[in-house]
């Protein structure tokens, strides 16, 4: 019990010492305290700068879009859902893809469950043909009158049924022998229009020599398709292949582009799958994408195989494949752009008198009307006000920062899928290496760009704080003293009107100079050094102990007189 009383006495003595030894300015009507500070929040956001990987700021904006909507929006881009059909099947006229004839699109969406349902085929230059058709954005077809003399046209197969009847690709004409003859074919078709024409043709590879002669008479056929600048000659490869839809033979699909003024020449003595007309080659920004995301009624400029994503951020890590005006793909999951100042959470109020501190010690929480401001303590009490001019100066330079980053990184283009056949494996490896290198480079550039912008933001906001402090110092001059923590001790009576004049820049130091000079000398003369404070502390403690002992002794004597306490002295 006595130990507790002693500790209480020591604490009270120390408090008395501080109260009388520090000479707090706001207890004196002749002085005031003015502190400058900046906005702070309890929990800031960590960002990276050039000099620091982890620096806390009051506010930051995420620059990386890391999730999609999970659905493909059909506006503003025209989306064509391929459903069960691939683009090439729709191009050739597979019976189950008739609904796509003459369709147009901005983006053709191929599904993983798409399948062919006609005679088995392959396209040696599949990726190029797919890309040309996809970028054209249409399957509009123009029939032409080719003259095929001495052969049977419109061949069909049980592998390609329309209803219950055997059929074939609607855009191709399977030519076989007529009677027991298959004459040499030599057909020309000039391009008298002012646009490029895409012709699709093919070569049939029978599974046996018997099938070859039954269809084309000759033991080996040949197909040559030429223009003035190109020529393709294909000799059928006769042989058994894995059975597909009841067929062991195959059709190889080829394509030729005929320029305006050029001529298409077709020579064959067998195995020709002839064109029925042409597709008009268009140049545009249409494309194709493999995705199983559902198509929905919504608006989005950017589409990925995962679904549409917003394009209000400069970067995304949802998918490398994109269509439309999309953020740049980077490897990082997050890149935060500082849109606020350095955050220094406000410390707990120290001391029973609630001392205030300036920006050098900490920030101020709860200052919602500005980034920079003033706090004061004077004879009229305490107050706080934001400095809107310095706040606006910082905001003007920061507000456009996000838009500038987007402008530097967004490109209005789409990244198409790259496909290569097995024989182009080395090209595919090289392409993958180039794409990976580009992504690595962009990821590094993005991180560097954001770090530079963050460094600039923090330096800028620190600079505005220092400018405001120096502006205040120049106003007060010798009428106040820099306390070293972002505060000024004003050596004259500075009421609220005086404080306001300092904030708005109309303070006249000459008016208060004499009073401030006089008060400075008086206050300095009685300021106690730390050594005197120690002596006062010990003297106060000793007196307190003495008084406590006197009170305790008096209580004991009183109790003994009343008989409440009995003392037995034993020898």
UniProtKB/Swiss-Prot annotation:
A lipid is attached at residues 560, 567, 570 (S-palmitoyl cysteine). Keywords: Clathrin- and caveolin-independent endocytosis of virus by host, Clathrin-mediated endocytosis of virus by host, Disulfide bond, Fusion of virus membrane with host endosomal membrane, Fusion of virus membrane with host membrane, Glycoprotein, Hemagglutinin, Host cell membrane, Host membrane, Host-virus interaction, Lipoprotein, Membrane, Palmitate, Signal, Transmembrane, Transmembrane helix, Viral attachment to host cell, Viral envelope protein, Viral penetration into host cytoplasm, Virion, Virus endocytosis by host, Virus entry into host cell. It is a single-pass type I membrane protein. It is found in: Virion membrane; Host apical cell membrane. The record marks 350-351 as: Cleavage. Residues 22-535 are extracellular. It comes from the Viruses. Major glycoprotein, comprises over 80% of the envelope proteins present in virus particle. The extent of infection into host organism is determined by HA. Influenza viruses bud from the apical surface of polarized epithelial cells (e.g. bronchial epithelial cells) into lumen of lungs and are therefore usually pneumotropic. The reason is that HA is cleaved by tryptase clara which is restricted to lungs. However, HAs of H5 and H7 pantropic avian viruses subtypes can be cleaved by furin and subtilisin-type enzymes, allowing the virus to grow in other organs than lungs. This is Hemagglutinin. It comes from Influenza A virus (strain A/Equine/Jillin/1/1989 H3N8).
């Amino acid at each position: 019990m006595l130990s507790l009383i002693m500790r209480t006495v020591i604490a009270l003595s120390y408090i008395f010492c501080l109260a009388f030894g520090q000479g707090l300015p706001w207890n004196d009507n002749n002085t005031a305290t003015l502190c400058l500070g900046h906005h702070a929040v309890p929990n800031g956001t960590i960002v990276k700068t050039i000099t620091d990987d982890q620096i806390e700021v009051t506010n930051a904006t995420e620059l990386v879009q890391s999730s999609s909507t999970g659905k493909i929006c059909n506006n503003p881009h025209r989306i064509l859902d391929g459903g069960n059909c691939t683009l090439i099947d729709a191009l050739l006229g597979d019976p189950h893809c008739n609904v796509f004839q003459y369709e147009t699109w901005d983006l053709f969406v191929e599904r993983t469950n798409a399948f062919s349902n006609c005679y088995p085929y392959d396209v040696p230059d599949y990726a190029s043909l797919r890309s040309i058709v996809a970028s054209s954005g249409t399957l509009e077809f123009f029939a032409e009158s080719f003259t095929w003399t001495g052969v049977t046209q419109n061949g069909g197969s049980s592998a390609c049924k329309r209803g219950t009847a055997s059929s074939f690709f609607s855009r191709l004409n399977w030519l076989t022998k007529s009677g027991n003859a298959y004459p040499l074919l030599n057909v020309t078709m000039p391009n008298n229009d002012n646009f490029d024409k895409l012709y699709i043709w093919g070569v049939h590879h029978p599974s046996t020599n018997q099938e070859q002669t039954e269809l084309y008479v000759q033991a080996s056929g040949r197909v040559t398709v030429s223009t003035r600048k190109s020529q393709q000659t294909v000799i059928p490869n006769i042989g058994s292949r894995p059975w597909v839809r009841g067929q062991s033979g195959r059709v190889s699909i080829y394509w030729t582009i005929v320029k305006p003024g050029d001529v298409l020449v077709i020579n064959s003595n067998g195995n020709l799958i002839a064109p029925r007309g042409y597709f008009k080659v268009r140049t545009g920004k249409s494309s194709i994408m493999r995705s199983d995301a559902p198509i929905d009624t919504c608006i989005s400029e950017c589409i990925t195989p995962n679904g549409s994503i917003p394009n209000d951020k400069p970067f995304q890590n949802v998918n490398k494949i994109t269509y439309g005006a999309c953020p740049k793909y980077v490897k990082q999951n997050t890149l935060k752009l500082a849109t606020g100042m350095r955050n220094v959470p406000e410390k707990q109020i120290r001391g029973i008198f609630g001392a205030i501190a300036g920006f050098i010690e900490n920030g101020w929480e709860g200052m919602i009307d500005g980034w920079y401001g003033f706090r004061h303590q004077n004879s009229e009490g305490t107050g706080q006000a934001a400095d809107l001019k310095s706040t606006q100066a910082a905001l003007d330079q920061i507000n456009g920062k996000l838009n500038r980053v987007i402008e530097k990184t967004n490109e209005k283009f789409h990244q198409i899928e790259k496909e290569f056949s097995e024989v182009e494996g080395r090209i595919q490896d090289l392409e993958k290496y180039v794409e990976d290198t580009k992504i690595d480079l962009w990821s590094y550039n993005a991180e560097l760009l954001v770090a530079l912008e963050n460094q600039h933001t923090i330096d800028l906001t620190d600079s505005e704080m220092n400018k405001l402090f120096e502006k205040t110092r120049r106003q007060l001059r010798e009428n106040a003293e820099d306390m070293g923590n972002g505060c000024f001790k004003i050596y004259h009576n500075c009421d609220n009107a005086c404080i306001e004049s300092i904030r708005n820049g109309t303070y006249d130091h000459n008016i208060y100079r004499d009073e401030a000079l006089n008060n400075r000398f008086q206050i300095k003369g009685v300021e106690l050094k730390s050594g005197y404070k120690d002596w006062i502390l010990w003297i106060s403690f000793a007196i307190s102990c003495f008084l406590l002992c006197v009170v305790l002794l008096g209580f004991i004597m009183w109790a003994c007189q009343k008989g409440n306490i009995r003392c037995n002295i034993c020898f």
